[in-house]
Amino acid sequence: MLLALALLAGNASAAGVDAAEHDAFWLWSGVAAQPVLAQARTLYVLQGQVSAPRYSDGRARLIAQGIAIPRLKQGEVWVVYRAHTLHWNEDIYRTLLSQLRRWRAAGNPVVGVQIDFDARTRYLHEYVDFLQDLRTRLPKDCKLSITGLMDWGSNAAPETINRLAGVVDEVVVQTYQGRQTIPNYQAYLPRVARLQLPFRIGLAQYGQWRAPDYLAKSRWFRGYVVFLQNP
């Protein structure tokens, strides 16, 4: 039985990016399970959202989201946290680590944590500082993944990108915004392909994608992750 067979349900049609051609997926809150999950070898599963401070105490909060803890036996699973702020308090870290332990205790092959945060280029150095601290809090056998914006390769200082290489195990560069493919995504790809750390390309299901020949030639390229959506 392949990874996520227990999540299999419903039918889906595809246009543009065909999820059936891939084996790594993001599974987000509110998205119905699709037949392609039966072929998944890697799943990135949303488990929470870290909200920016909105109340009088000025504290960020981790709001649980996503599916209930399943019992998956094969492949790789990453638990994902969508962050709207980097000002995390100790309660957030404790909750994250507790969720990680529960997923593993249920027998799921959790290999790491992914942070989904839209770090603008000029604040990327602050994001790296945050990730360095988070890395020290994770178990030694827990990898760290992040999502990345396409303009990092064009606008970020090389030394900042190099710092990322020493902190995260991979970056998944998103070619979409919201649920739509960025119209000029191809203009960013040459610099993305020159990243000097393991990277994947994130695609929106039903979006647009044409792979340039040079992408697969990068020794750092690790394939694709498809953001599943309801038809």
Labelled PLM ranges:
Residues 11-231:
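Secreted glycan hydrolases and related glycan-binding modules that recognize and/or cleave
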